[in-house]
Amino acid sequence: MGRDEHIVEHPRGKGVERVDEAYAIRRYQQAAALLPLRWQRLCRQVPEEQQAEAEELRLRAGQTLTLLLRGGEVPAARERPYPVVTQTELEQLCDGVTDYSRYAAADTLSRGYLTARGGFRIGVCGTAVLRDGVNTNLRDISSVTIRI
């Protein structure tokens, strides 16, 4: 395996495949572009080695943005005090991904995820909105995870 290649699990569980570093960085940058502006800026400051290795971007209300790397979870920010994600930013992220039409995405959102441009799967946690005992939507978003 060359220095610019990484072995990653196939997204559909079909073994492993080699992904070149440039592609992995591009996917990271595309995922980061889904974030509110201040988090996009922070993600651009992450070293390319970590960008290439990142598997997820994790945002939790009241905590800092973290990256899931092969070795574990690390803060995206390099210096303390780490900036904190707000619930409003999580709501903005979901609104942006759904083109401000969460109602149109209510089917998948009620199951806890969204699919963004580029095929990114976004896990969403919040308070279930029930109608006749059936989960129809989410509100009060508390965390979002973007799978790269």
What does each model-found stretch correspond to?
Residues 72-84, 123-125:
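Short amphipathic beta-strand/extended segments with alternating polar/hydrophobic composition
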Residues 44-47, 95-98, 102, 129:
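Signal for well-folded cores of large energy- and translation-related assemblies
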Residues 81-109:
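A charged amphipathic helix-loop-strand protein-protein interaction module that recurs
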Residues 102-148:
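P-loop NTP-binding catalytic core
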Residues 7, 13-78:
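N-terminal anchoring/assembly modules that precede and organize ATP-driven motor systems
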Residues 57-59, 65-67, 93, 97, ...:
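Generic structural hydrophobic/aromatic packing signal, biased to beta-strands
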